[in-house]
A protein has these predicted regions:
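Beta-propeller domain segments
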Residues: 2, 11-175
């Protein structure tokens, strides 16, 4: 991803555009800063919140809001589909969407990439960052949530496993 800018675009209440290759909605995109060409990195995203490139592993990780639960941490793979609006561990807040978007629970069984980690109920997932080396070698990413949590992941463990969760007093903090 050298010389590239990565960014994400949510589906902006146009959920089926996340599955259309000719739309930017629901996608992670890269733009080469030298030749200005862009590429679709992945598709099938609902509402991406955080995006980080881990250079030492050549890995992209993202966080994404699900519908009424089903917030996700994803390992992004080039050309892969993450399932929205067909697969999610969340549920619709409005019954009128259930018929045309059944939200199948298994991503893998339906041909999509499974999240590394999902949260039901929702944690209001937000940013994901690589842990700076000055914090030591114990953790590789921090994931924040909209309220009281900061989740850490140990470097030697699978990214989807939360090793430690720090809870903040909700009177004083909202983490983004």
């Amino acid at each position: 991803y050298k010389d590239n800018i990565l960014f994400s675009i949510g589906e902006y209440r146009q959920r089926f555009l996340a599955q259309k290759k000719d739309s930017f909605f629901g996608k992670i995109i890269s733009i080469n800063i030298k030749d200005k060409k862009f590429n679709m990195v992945s598709m099938g995203h609902r509402n991406p919140q955080g995006l980080v490139y881990i250079k030492k592993d050549d890995t992209i990780l993202s966080t994404e809001h699900g519908p009424k639960g089903g917030d996700e941490v994803n390992k992004i793979e080039i050309g892969k589909n993450y399932g929205w609006p067909i697969a999610s561990y969340g549920r619709h807040s409005d019954d009128k969407f259930r018929e045309d978007s059944p939200l199948l629970k298994s991503h893998k069984k339906n041909g999509f990439v499974e999240p590394l980690k999902y949260f039901v109920p929702s944690i209001g997932i937000s940013q994901i960052i690589e842990v700076p080396s000055r914090f030591g070698d114990d953790y590789n990413v921090f994931v924040t949530s909209m309220g009281k949590n900061l989740k850490f992941n140990k470097d030697k463990e699978p990214v989807g496993r939360t090793i430690y969760q720090l809870k903040f007093n909700s009177d004083y903090s909202k983490l983004r």
